[in-house]
């Protein structure tokens, strides 16, 4: 084995001494760290006057049109003492006495003619009274269900501000019982059942119930309103007489309000239906919501569109929008929980459904 020549061997390094700097107490930071951290400002006091501008005087909020603003929520009218109701009850009782005396005299006369006629009249009277009792019980049950919906809504509003989880669970159970007849709420009921042992405060539990139970019902309610508005718009556009328009609009409104009440568990009878219709129209009369907003009217009839549309078609669109507004008011009254976790629908949400009817270039025309 041959050795490497001496001139090619590496020179050994001689020992040397080095001075080590003492480590600093804080670790070194990269040069860009100071740029990333915001500089803290020492607290100061300001003597400038702060003026709060009310919403009514705010120029950025004053320009909102009626359609962009939040529509008023329909609420049931307060029950007050009325002399008209008192007079109606008094004359109704008097008429009942008169009918009772007439029936008594009739049965007595039938017994004087023949016994079998008297017994037949008594049997018919018993059948009639039994049927009347069933009708009265159904009407009272319908009114009770409507009152229960409003009671649940008031309890939910109070518990959303201040309430315990146990009270909120009782409220959610009442809402489940009210809507269990609808197959759309099956998934929501299973979600709420799975969350029974979870720790949830009252407002969030009510919001969860609204999203899981009422969201599918709200979608169904929207479809009911859209279909009713379309039918009213088309019938108004093709009907030959204004009386036909009015009759069909009233028929469609009554059917829409009844379907809305049955959807949310109200299921009113005839008397309860009249009461619900009175609350709906009272809300629309007080708020002036039957008339559409300037922005929406300009969208439907403005920009030269009125000159290209027939008068009947314009009336059909307006009646369809009015039907949609009535449907929204009925939705507010029949819904067991107010719109908080979910967005409340507005008239603008139903405009796309009526757009084929107001578009002059549409094939529907």
Curated annotation (Swiss-Prot):
Record's keyword annotation contains Membrane: yes
Q: List cellular component terms (GO).
A: plasma membrane
Specify residue ranges for compositional bias: Basic and acidic residues.
Answer: 1-10
- Keywords assigned by UniProt, alphabetized: Cell inner membrane, Cell membrane, Membrane, Transmembrane, Transmembrane helix
Keyword Ribosomal protein on this protein?
no
For membrane topology, the record states:
Multi-pass membrane protein
What subcellular locations does the record give?
A: Cell inner membrane
Q: Where is this region: Disordered?
A: 1-47
Q: What is its main location?
A: membrane
Which InterPro entries does the entry mention?
Answer: DUF697 (IPR021147), UPF0283 (IPR006507)
Q: What residue ranges are annotated as transmembrane?
A: 83-103, 117-137
The superkingdom listed in its UniProt entry is Bacteria
User: According to its UniProt record, what is one Pfam family this protein matches?
Assistant: DUF697
Provide the family line. Belongs to the UPF0283 family.
**NCBIfam families from the UniProt entry:** hyp_HI0043 (TIGR01620)
Q: What is this protein called?
A: UPF0283 membrane protein Avi_2471
């Amino acid at each position: 084995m041959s050795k490497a020549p001496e001139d090619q061997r590496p020179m050994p390094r001689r020992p040397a001494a080095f001075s080590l700097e003492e480590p600093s107490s804080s670790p070194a930071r990269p040069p860009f760290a100071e740029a990333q951290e915001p500089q803290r400002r020492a607290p100061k006091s300001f003597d400038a006057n702060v003026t709060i501008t009310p919403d009514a005087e705010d120029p950025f909020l004053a320009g909102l049109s009626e359609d962009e603003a939040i529509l008023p929520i329909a609420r049931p009218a307060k029950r007050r003492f009325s002399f008209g109701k008192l007079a109606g009850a008094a004359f109704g009782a008097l008429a009942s006495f008169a009918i009772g005396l007439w029936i008594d005299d009739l049965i007595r006369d039938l017994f004087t003619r023949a016994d079998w006629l008297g017994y037949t009249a008594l049997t018919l009277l018993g059948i009639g009274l039994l049927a009347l009792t069933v009708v009265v019980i159904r009407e009272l049950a319908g009114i009770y269900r409507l009152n229960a919906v409003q009671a649940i809504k008031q309890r939910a509003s109070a518990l959303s501000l201040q309430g315990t989880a146990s009270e909120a669970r009782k409220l959610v159970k009442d809402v489940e019982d009210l809507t269990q007849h609808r197959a759309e709420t099956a998934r929501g009921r299973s979600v709420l059942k799975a969350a029974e042992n979870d720790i949830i405060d009252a407002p969030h539990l009510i919001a969860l119930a609204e999203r899981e139970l009422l969201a599918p019902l709200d979608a169904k309610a929207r479809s009911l309103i859209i279909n009713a508005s379309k039918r009213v718009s088309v019938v108004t556009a093709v009907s030959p007489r204004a009386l036909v328009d009015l009759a069909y609009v009233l028929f469609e409104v009554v059917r829409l309000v009844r379907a809305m009440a049955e959807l949310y568990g109200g299921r009113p009878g005839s008397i309860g239906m009249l009461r619900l219709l009175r609350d709906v129209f009272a809300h629309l009369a007080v708020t002036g919501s039957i008339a559409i907003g300037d922005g929406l009217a300009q969208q439907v009839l403005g920009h030269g569109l009125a000159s290209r549309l027939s008068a009947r078609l314009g009336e059909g669109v307006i009646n369809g929008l009015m039907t949609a507004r009535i449907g929204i008011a009925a939705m507010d009254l029949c819904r067991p929980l107010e719109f908080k976790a979910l967005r409340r629908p507005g008239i603008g949400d139903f405009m796309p459904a009526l757009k084929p009817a107001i578009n002059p270039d549409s094939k529907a025309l």
